[in-house]
Amino acid sequence: MTSKKEIEDALKIVKNKFYDPKLKTRFANYTKNIQFTFNDLNTTYLIKIRNGDLESLKEESIDSPDIQVIIESRIMIDILNKKINPMKAYTTGKLKAKGKLTDLLKLQKLL
């Protein structure tokens, strides 16, 4: 089983992507809350993006995130380490996501 520390380390990969100039351009003027729920760890992390910048990434849950992702921690780590494609994880039911299609497509760029 994946530990909470392992998922926090993996989420740093997402955090570091916000320093990439190409990603900053793609996310310019983008303000959303993205919530990742890891049922196997019984925990939720919230990424707050404000005007294309990462405002925060912390263990937190809100009632109505713009994007809700439900995934097992091992699958998330495999996605971030490029062992599995996020679209394949979605189509096989390993990743469940709720949100506007345009937001979900942007989410792919973070993963």
Residue ranges and their predicted role:
Residues 1-111:
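Feature captures hydrophobic
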